[in-house]
C-alpha cells in the first residue's frame, strides 16, 4: 500500500501510464521518422543541431548491432538520417535522438497536427493531487522539451503548469536505481516521500531499489502485464487517493 502520510511528490512515466502506448508508437514515432529529414536539411538549424548530431555520430561509430545501417563519416547531416530512422524503429532511448524527435514534434504540436490523447482519468487526478499539496514531476525517456510539448497540447488542454520538475534520460537510464536516487535528491526529498508510477517492471524495480514508493500502471494496450508481486497496480489514476480507494492491490 501507499504511505500517503509520508508522500510529498508523485513522479509519472508517460507511455502506458498517462497516454496509450499506441499514440507514441503509432503517431509520434512515425511523425518524427517522416519529418527528421526536413529538420536536418534546414540551414538555420545547422549550428543548434551540431552538438546533438555529433553525439549521434559517436553512437553510430560505436554501434554494435549488425542490423544497423553501415557507418558513414560524412559531415552532411542528412547522412545520419538512415541511422536515426533505424534507431526510431528500434525504440532506442538515445538522448540526442530523443531531443531531435522533440524538435520535429514541436512543429507537429504547434501546427495542430499532433494532440496528446490522455487517458480520461489523468487530468482530474493530476489536479486533485496538486490541490492536496503534492508536487508533480515527469520522468520519461522522451526529452524534457518533448514532455513539455506533450502536456502542453493535450485532449484536456495545457496541463504543463501542473508539473514542477521534468526529467529525461540525461538524468540517467530509467532501469537503474541510481537515476531515482538522483531524482529524489533533486527534489530535495527522502526517497520514501516520492511515489513513482510506471507501466515498466524494470523501472518499478529500479525505483523500488532506490527506496521510492512505487505504483504499477496496467492500461489497455500495454505490452507488458505487470506481476502481482508489485505492492500496488492500478488501471486508473483515479484509484489513487489518500482516502484508501478501491482498486488497489
Curated annotation (Swiss-Prot):
Pathway as given in its UniProt record: Amino-acid biosynthesis; L-methionine biosynthesis via salvage pathway; L-methionine from S-methyl-5-thio-alpha-D-ribose 1-phosphate: step 3/6; Amino-acid biosynthesis; L-methionine biosynthesis via salvage pathway; L-methionine from S-methyl-5-thio-alpha-D-ribose 1-phosphate: step 4/6
Pfam families named among the record's database cross-references: Hydrolase (PF00702)
An annotated GO BP: L-methionine salvage from methylthioadenosine
Enzyme class: hydrolase
Keywords (A to Z) from UniProt: Amino-acid biosynthesis, Hydrolase, Magnesium, Metal-binding, Methionine biosynthesis
Database matches in InterPro entries: Enolase-ppase_E1 (IPR023943), HAD-like_sf (IPR036412), HAD_sf (IPR023214)
Domain of life of the organism encoding this protein: Bacteria
Catalytic reactions on record: 5-methylsulfanyl-2,3-dioxopentyl phosphate + H2O = 1,2-dihydroxy-5-(methylsulfanyl)pent-1-en-3-one + phosphate
Known EC number: 3.1.3.77
MF GO annotations: 2,3-diketo-5-methylthiopentyl-1-phosphate enolase activity; 2-hydroxy-3-keto-5-methylthiopentenyl-1-phosphate phosphatase activity; acireductone synthase activity; magnesium ion binding
Cofactors, names only: Mg(2+)
Signal sequence bounds: none
Record note on cofactor: Binds 1 Mg(2+) ion per subunit.
Cystine pairs: none
Subunit structure: Monomer.
Function: Bifunctional enzyme that catalyzes the enolization of 2,3-diketo-5-methylthiopentyl-1-phosphate (DK-MTP-1-P) into the intermediate 2-hydroxy-3-keto-5-methylthiopentenyl-1-phosphate (HK-MTPenyl-1-P), which is then dephosphorylated to form the acireductone 1,2-dihydroxy-3-keto-5-methylthiopentene (DHK-MTPene).
Listed NCBIfam families: enolase-ppase
Family statement drawn from the similarity comment of this UniProt entry: Belongs to the HAD-like hydrolase superfamily. MasA/MtnC family.
Protein name in UniProt: Enolase-phosphatase E1
UniProt organism field: Synechococcus sp. (strain RCC307)
Amino acid at each position: 500500500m501507499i504511505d500517503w502520510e509520508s508522500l510529498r511528490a508523485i513522479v509519472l512515466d508517460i507511455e502506458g501510464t498517462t497516454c496509450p502506448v499506441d499514440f507514441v508508437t503509432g503517431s509520434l514515432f512515425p511523425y518524427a521518422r517522416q519529418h527528421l529529414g526536413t529538420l536536418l536539411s534546414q540551414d538555420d538549424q545547422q549550428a543548434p543541431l551540431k552538438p546533438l548530431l555529433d553525439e549521434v555520430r559517436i553512437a553510430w561509430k560505436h554501434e554494435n548491432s549488425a542490423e544497423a545501417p553501415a557507418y558513414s563519416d560524412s559531415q552532411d547531416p542528412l547522412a545520419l538520417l538512415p541511422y536515426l530512422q533505424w534507431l526510431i524503429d528500434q525504440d532506442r532511448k538515445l538522448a540526442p535522438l530523443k531531443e531531435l524527435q522533440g524538435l520535429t514534434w514541436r512543429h507537429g504540436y504547434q501546427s495542430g497536427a499532433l494532440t496528446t490523447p490522455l487517458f480520461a482519468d489523468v487530468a482530474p487526478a493530476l489536479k486533485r493531487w496538486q490541490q492536496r499539496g503534492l508536487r508533480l514531476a515527469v520522468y520519461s525517456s522522451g526529452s524534457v522539451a518533448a514532455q513539455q510539448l506533450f502536456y502542453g497540447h493535450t485532449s484536456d488542454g495545457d496541463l504543463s503548469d501542473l508539473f514542477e520538475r521534468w526529467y529525461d534520460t540525461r538524468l540517467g537510464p530509467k532501469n537503474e536505481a541510481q537515476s531515482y536516487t538522483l531524482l529524489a535528491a533533486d527534489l530535495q526529498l527522502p526517497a520514501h516521500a516520492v511515489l513513482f508510477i510506471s507501466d515498466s517492471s524494470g523501472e518499478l524495480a529500479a525505483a523500488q531499489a532506490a527506496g521510492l514508493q512505487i505504483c504499477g500502471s496496467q492500461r489497455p494496450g500495454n505490452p507488458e502485464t505487470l506481476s502481482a508481486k508489485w505492492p500496488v497496480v492500478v488501471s486508473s489514476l483515479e484509484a489513487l487517493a489518500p482516502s484508501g480507494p478501491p482498486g488497489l492491490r
